[in-house]
Amino acid sequence: MRILLTNDDGIHAEGLAALERIARTMSDDVWIVAPETDQSGLAHSLSLSEPLRLRKVSDKHYALRGTPTDCVIMGIRQVMDIKPDLILSGVNSGSNVADDVTYSGTIAGAIEGTLQGVRSFALSQAYVHENGTRVVPWEVVQAHAPALLGKLIDIDLPDGTFLNLNFPNCRPDEVSGTEVTAQGNLAFNLQVDERADGRGFPYYWLRFGERSGIFRPGTDIHALKQNRISVTPLKLDLTDYSVQDRVARALGHGVAD
């Protein structure tokens, strides 16, 4: 089995090293095409106005000055001579749950893999801040992902569907199981910090404030709070079929077929 790895935290990210160790429990034919720099929050963006610079780091390891989407395309179309059987995107430093998935470059790696016709999974590890420092328990995903992926690798997924895997912030022996979940909902409370440069001109940082949400049972955010691994099937079709008829009637078209 040929496996292509990517991420959005960059080629030197600890989560990518963890993902390679996980992938090598499944195959010896593991390839990496990952961003040269941190691409967090760029979602499914595609570089069309700038050239892509590809750098070979070592055997089957490549860094690309581009987005996670670019990395998957380059991996399949340029780097690898044969299409991969599986794409793993991650392991992200931080969960990708609820509305996070719309911002996530990690999710985008799996989206692009799915668009390219390759079975794709996104993996993310929840963390906690302690005394202002991010503490990521990578040992959780490393302990539990190999067996979980082994169970999921051969299931029949519809075209346009991929799996989003999130691992809880706890010790490996505190994981209370695995749950198949739906996407939850969080209020992000995005904040704008205004600052001034050395010449007095303003510049801005976006940051997340305290997040809030309704942690309904059966959702990804609820599962993580229960120290459970969340497995969420996501699909590329964003159509809201429940309102098609309503929109058709408003336009005087009658009920949509």
Curated annotation (Swiss-Prot):
Its EC number is 3.1.3.5. Gene3D superfamilies: Survival protein SurE-like phosphatase/nucleotidase. Keywords: Cytoplasm, Hydrolase, Metal-binding, Nucleotide-binding. Pfam families: SurE (PF01975). It is found in: Cytoplasm. HAMAP family: SurE (MF_00060). Belongs to the SurE nucleotidase family. This is 5'-nucleotidase SurE. It comes from Rhizobium rhizogenes (strain K84 / ATCC BAA-868). The lineage of its organism: Bacteria, Pseudomonadati, Pseudomonadota, Alphaproteobacteria, Hyphomicrobiales. The gene is surE.
